[in-house]
């Protein structure tokens, strides 16, 4: 891109883009048939939300799968649901701590999603993907080893004024401190969020929805889309005129509700406290 092209891009209006942000689906966690059916029903509800919202990109910010031992049958059933994503949309998946991108990763062993429409953020140093039609780029650094030394936002690229800048990360928010006491694995500090310079930071790792925006950085944990036998919600993120970012909660619904046995409660829709799962 030349200087004159950059100037023209910077002064022209960015297109409106809608993101659907989710995380922590933990597909493959259940060993019984009913549990497996529920996992797929939740994914169906997430996919249906893309169609209903006319979402452009579906962002899965870690722990799409519960572990790296999931087999071919689970992946094939997952892909059958992902094939229902609307034809205009794309899927971006960031490996988290449960489905980390190590040598035995499910993402190395199997194809996930439709070729040409699915991106796995699989570079240990961080991968940046440009969606030219939306003038939007997505960056994320996959979890390789879930430890206190892994900083999910390390190496994030500088902000580009002529594009939408979206960052994905999977880890534990530590507030203004750089680390917790006792230390937590995959820490993310408020200072790191501010330093990224992204228009939106899609976070995963916490099961409950939480706004951890800091300074000018709009950063949210989507929370898991399923809570206690009830469908939850996804984040509906509209990148719009004037470089405004509007984040709303979109409750999930659909045919899968009957299989699951209920809908989200009011409790699951409330902002989360700053907590994380104890097994992480």
PLM features: what roles do these ranges have?
Residues 1-17, 259, 266-280:
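Non-catalytic terminal accessory segments
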Residues 1-81, 87:
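N-terminal active-site segment of His-dependent metallophosphoesterases
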Residues 16-18, 135, 244-245:
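Short, mixed charged/polar active-site loops
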Residues 57, 68-229:
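His/Asp/Glu-rich metal-coordinating catalytic cores
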Residues 125-132, 219-278:
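Binuclear metal-dependent phosphoesterase catalytic core
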């Amino acid at each position: 891109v030349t200087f004159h092209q950059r100037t023209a891009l910077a002064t022209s209006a960015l297109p409106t883009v809608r993101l659907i942000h989710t995380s922590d689906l933990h597909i493959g966690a259940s060993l019984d048939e009913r549990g497996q059916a529920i996992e797929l029903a939740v994914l169906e509800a997430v996919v249906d939300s893309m169609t209903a919202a006319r979402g452009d990109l579906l962002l899965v910010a870690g722990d799409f799968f519960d572990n790296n031992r999931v087999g071919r049958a689970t992946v094939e059933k997952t892909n059958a649901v992902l094939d229902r994503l609307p034809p205009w949309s794309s899927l971006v998946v960031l490996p988290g701590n449960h489905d980390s991108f190590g040598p035995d990763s499910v993402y190395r062993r199997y194809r996930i999603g439709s070729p040409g429409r699915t991106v796995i953020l699989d570079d240990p140093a961080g991968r940046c993907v440009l969606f030219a039609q939306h003038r939007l780029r997505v960056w994320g650094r996959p979890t390789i080893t879930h430890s206190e030394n892994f900083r999910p936002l390390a190496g994030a690229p500088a902000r580009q004024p002529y594009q939408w800048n979206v960052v994905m990360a999977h880890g534990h928010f530590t507030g203004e401190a750089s680390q917790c006491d006792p230390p937590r694995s995959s820490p993310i500090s408020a200072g790191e969020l501010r330093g990224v310079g992204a228009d939106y930071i899609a976070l995963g790792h916490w099961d409950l929805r939480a706004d951890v925006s800091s300074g000018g950085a709009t950063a949210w944990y989507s929370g898991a889309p399923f809570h206690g036998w009830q469908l939850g919600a996804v984040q509906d993120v509209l990148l719009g005129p004037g470089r405004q970012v509007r984040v709303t909660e979109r409750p999930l619904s659909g045919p899968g509700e009957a299989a699951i046995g209920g809908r989200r409660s009011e409790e699951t829709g409330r902002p989360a406290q700053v907590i994380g799962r104890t097994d992480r």
